[in-house]
């Protein structure tokens, strides 16, 4: 399966909100919640690869030095064509993950929108490529 980097597709990826490209590692980061990356896809199979980092939430009063913490990983919504509701939502729960966005037996063309749902103060999320 062929892999395409963010640089390979820069002319085809439309961003909304505060996204930024980190050129050294060629990652397109979502900087805020509701940031969006949109593109047209034609084919039978599409994966997206993410780089993610977790934040930490306190599970009790912040004044308690022994309060337990839990990891918070970024959540993504996938919108297909003009559907007002996402076709799926998922948590990117490790530093490097690849997710299936589309699979069909025959080639199809769709407009795909990826939306970061979580606050940036709690997590970070970037796209490293497509395959």
Go through each PLM region and give its residues.
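N-terminal secretory targeting modules
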Residues: 1-131
């Amino acid at each position: 399966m062929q892999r395409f980097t963010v640089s390979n597709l820069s002319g085809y990826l439309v961003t909304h909100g505060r996204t930024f490209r980190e050129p050294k590692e060629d990652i397109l980061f979502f900087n805020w919640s509701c940031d969006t990356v949109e593109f047209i896809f034609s084919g039978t199979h599409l994966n997206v690869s993410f780089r993610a980092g977790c934040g930490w939430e306190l599970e009790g009063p912040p004044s308690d030095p022994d309060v337990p913490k839990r990891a918070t990983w970024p959540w993504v919504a996938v919108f297909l064509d003009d559907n007002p509701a996402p076709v799926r939502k998922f948590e990117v729960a490790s530093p490097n993950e690849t997710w299936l966005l589309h699979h069909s037996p025959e080639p199809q063309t769709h407009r795909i929108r990826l939306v970061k749902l979580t606050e940036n103060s709690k997590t970070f999320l970037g796209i490293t490529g497509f395959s």
